[in-house]
Swiss-Prot record:
Residue numbers binding glycerol: R82, E83, Y134, D244, Q245
Description of post-translational modifications: The phosphoenolpyruvate-dependent sugar phosphotransferase system (PTS), including enzyme I, and histidine-containing protein (HPr) are required for the phosphorylation, which leads to the activation of the enzyme.
Catalysed reactions, as listed in the record: glycerol + ATP = sn-glycerol 3-phosphate + ADP + H(+)
Gene name of the record: glpK
Function recorded in the entry: Key enzyme in the regulation of glycerol uptake and metabolism. Catalyzes the phosphorylation of glycerol to yield sn-glycerol 3-phosphate.
Name this protein carries in UniProt: Glycerol kinase
GO molecular-function term, one example from the UniProt record: glycerol kinase activity
Signal sequence region: none
SUPFAM superfamilies: Actin-like ATPase domain
Species of provenance: Bacillus velezensis (strain DSM 23117 / BGSC 10A6 / LMG 26770 / FZB42)
Cited PROSITE patterns: FGGY_KINASES_1, FGGY_KINASES_2
Residues involved in ADP binding: T12, R16, T266, G309, G410, N414
Binding of sn-glycerol 3-phosphate, residues: T12, R82, E83, Y134, D244
């Protein structure tokens, strides 16, 4: 009987279930969107029970449509939107409030207060993160402070906190396991990434009772088994978990120090494996745990770019320059260059290495000869310039030069962008055969835990190249183009 690994990819707008075989190939997949709630400007929330319902639905769809039986599933891996926060009642299993999403800015006031009290360095040194509404810690505090009766219940040990992985494992196991993995714990602003434990001082500052927190386990580990009433009468090992970006790093087989990947989604997330060293950044990068595996923890440096694929959507929907995103490549290739035009797509501020939330999008270098093609090309090029900003910061912090960049996400199908990215970084850019690297990473972590795959060496051998883009640009040209980008960013930041 052939067996498979089931990967649950719980994202910001949809939940997916993907069935992988021994070769790491996709056998079947299903996807279901769920509701986004915006109770106030800048706030983003999800209904945690609706997320759970969407996960059950995609699992059922995959099993029924693929024609397999549940006992052919050797294990389940979970990857999830990171930082999104659920607080629920231990006895009833009901969330006390909506899940507060990573994008939500509703804890800005709490963060401002913590920074004013001088806690920035304390959090940075212990967690590798910045005090920002992005991370879970202030979201938990907000729920305890704003939901009637929540703080009292939490202090009595009746409430549980979890990121989405914890919530799903708790639900799948029928409440038997309240756990998370190292990668997700490292995004909470409450976990000491050096001592590998919840930090009492940080919990005290945030006013979060320790009894709420999940147990932290390796990313490849049998956490629990599914309860039969949720899983076609079967008890299947839930055996792997990792935050989405760390999972993509694993799925890209970036197992050696200095290997890196860039995911081109709505925004971009670039991660570099720094091995067993947690490197503190001087250039606006986050220090994070990549995964816990084989009795050790590995770390990564992470850079966040807020606008990537959404800039192409803006050209399509806002500027109406084309009807299909694929056309952006055709238009960009009709001209030899952007003709001195630079687009700084700071629609929601700039992330790494600038961390400036007040700067807004700008266009520079327009002349009477500027065409639609130049404008589209300049917008695509801005994705690559931002990735170079991040990579330069990573190399400066780590002292490691990247040898190749592995890429995934929607925009990697754009050959023009990938070639320009390689030219600008002066390293080969590698696009894998399987683009679903986030779901694949979770499948691999689960598969190793249940013996479906032997180890990371076997997984590295399965990584297959679709296309490699090699740098063709001369140094002088690269320096000239990137110099123009830096001038454009500085000008945009001055215009407030």
């Amino acid at each position: 009987m052939e067996t498979y690994i089931l990967s649950i990819d719980q994202g910001t707008t949809s939940s997916r279930a993907i069935l992988f075989n021994k070769e790491g190939k996709i056998v079947h997949s299903a996807q279901k969107e769920f509701t986004q709630h915006f109770p106030q400007p800048g706030w983003v929330e999800h209904n945690a029970n609706e997320i759970w319902g969407s996960v059950l639905a995609v699992i059922a769809t995959v099993i029924s449509e693929s024609g397999i039986s549940a006992d052919q599933i050797a294990g389940i891996g979970i990857t999830n939107q990171r930082e999104t926060t659920v607080v629920w009642d231990k006895d009833t299993g009901k969330p006390v409030y909506n899940a507060i999403v990573w994008q939500s800015r509703q804890t800005s006031g709490i963060c401002e207060e913590l920074r004013e009290k001088g806690y920035n360095d304390t959090f940075r040194e212990k967690t590798g993160l910045l005090i920002d509404p992005y991370f879970s810690g202030t979201k938990v505090k907000w729920i305890l402070d704003n939901v009637e009766g929540a703080r009292e219940k939490a202090e009595n040990g009746n409430l549980l906190f979890g990121t989405i992985d914890s919530w799903l494992i708790w639900k799948m196991s029928g409440g038997a396991a309240h756990v998370t993995d190292y990668s997700n714990a490292s995004r909470t602003l409450m976990f000491n990434i050096h001592e590998l434990k919840w930090d009492d001082e940080l919990l005290d500052i945030l006013g979060v009772p320790k009894s709420m927190l999940p147990e932290v386990k390796p990313s490849s580990h049998v956490y629990a088994k599914t309860v039969d009433y949720h899983f076609f009468g079967k008890n299947i090992p839930i055996a792997g978990a990792a935050g989405d970006q760390q999972s993509a790093l694993f799925g890209q087989a970036c197992f050696e120090e200095g290997m890196g990947k860039n995911t081109y989604g709505t925004g971009c997330f670039m991660l570099m494996n720094t091995g067993e060293k947690a490197i503190t950044s001087d250039h606006g990068l986050l220090t994070t745990i990549a995964w816990g595996l084989d009795g050790k923890v590995e770390y990564a440096l992470e850079g966040s770019i807020f606008v990537a694929g959404s800039a192409i959507q803006w050209l399509r929907d806002g500027m109406r320059m084309f009807q299909d995103s694929k056309e952006s490549e055709t238009y960009a290739e009709r001209v030899d260059s952007a003709d001195g035009v630079y687009v700084v797509p700071a629609f929601v501020g700039l992330g790494t290495p600038y961390w400036d939330s007040d700067v807004r999008g700008s266009v520079f270098g327009l002349t009477r000869g500027t065409t639609k093609e130049h404008f589209i090309r300049a917008t695509l090029e801005s994705l690559a310039y931002q990735a170079k900003d991040v990579l330069d910061a990573m190399e400066a912090d780590s002292g490691i030069s990247l040898k190749t960049l592995r890429v995934d996400g929607g925009a990697v199908k754009n050959n023009f962008l990938m070639q320009f990215q390689s030219d600008l970084l002066d390293v080969p850019v590698e696009r894998p055969e399987i683009n679903e690297t986030t779901a694949l990473g979770a499948a691999y972590l689960a598969g190793i835990a249940v013996g479906y795959w032997k180890d990371s060496t076997e997984i590295a051998d399965q990584w297959n190249l679709d296309k490699q883009f090699k740098p063709e640009m001369e140094d002088e040209k690269r320096d000239e183009l990137y110099g123009g980008w830096k001038k454009a960013v500085n000008a945009a930041m001055a215009f407030k």
